[in-house]
Amino acid sequence: MEMVLDFFVWFAEAVERRIFTSLKMEATRYFVATFVVFVAVWIVFEGALKTRKLGKMASRRPDARIRQVRREIFYSICSVVVYMVMSIFLFEGAANGVFKFYNDPDQYGTAYRYGSVLLLLLAHDAYFYWSHRAMHHPWLFKWTHAVHHRTKDPTPFTAYAFAPGEAAINFMIIPLYALILPLHDMTTVYFLWFQIFRNAIAHAGYELIPDGWARHPILGLNASVTHHHMHHERMTGNYGFYFTFWDRLMGTEHKDYLDRVDEATKKKAHPEGLSTVTG
């Protein structure tokens, strides 16, 4: 009983020290990234991208669109709260030497510091692919991933629309990585910003890559917007986040994925407002 009381005292003190920093960090990243991507794709460049729309969100009734976005923002705020609480533990663990964070840029050298960015990216992609597949198991889906899949036609606000269980699973890549390998403080900050922008773009609802990239042997390793959009449409396959190679290696990429990208990137606007596929 005394240990339980000690824990609650420690946690209350940690919350007092960290809550505003954690909340500001998590909320700022979500709202800045999602609103920037939404304004850029759905408002500023909507005219130029209209033939690249992947779903039917634009043709739905305004009240239905508003309900979807409200739901996505609500669950995203819930995820921000989960991330805030878990960040408190992360900060406290880092302060007590549990995790291998460091702030001296010379401690492990420049090569390691920059190389760790790529290493973390690859680690996150692998973690995302396998945890994502696991959450599609019937035993886990209802409690973790079902909320995210209520959206069949994503918007940038879908990025953090998770059940608390999925939010917790997604958060764990940073503490797991930092338990094993050193991670510079600023590398972590830059990565978290990159991750949320990449997440919002993956749910943008418009294909953004140039025509031909998806079929390129190197550029095609990048997971396009279509790649993740098809996952939302079909609720299976295309589990990767940054890259396509795990899906290709494990045979989980949709067979018509490249054709869908071609369809989105080759369409040209017709004078009458219709569209056609060229090539």
Which residue stretches match the model-derived regions?
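Cytosolic/stromal cytosol-facing helical appendages immediately following the last transmembrane segment
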Residues: 1-31, 48, 56-65, 140-279
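Juxtamembrane/interfacial segments flanking transmembrane helices
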Residues: 96-101, 127-144, 205-213
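Alpha-helical transmembrane segments
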Residues: 22-37, 111-124, 187-191
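Core segments of transmembrane alpha-helices
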Residues: 78-87, 91, 95, 162-178
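Juxtamembrane helix-loop-helix connectors linking adjacent transmembrane helices
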Residues: 85-123
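Function-critical hydrophobic alpha-helical transmembrane segments in multi-pass membrane proteins
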Residues: 110-149, 158-162, 171
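Membrane-helix interface linkers and caps
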Residues: 10-14, 38-71, 94-105
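Transmembrane alpha-helical segments that form the membrane-embedded catalytic/substrate-channel core
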Residues: 36-46, 119-136, 191-208
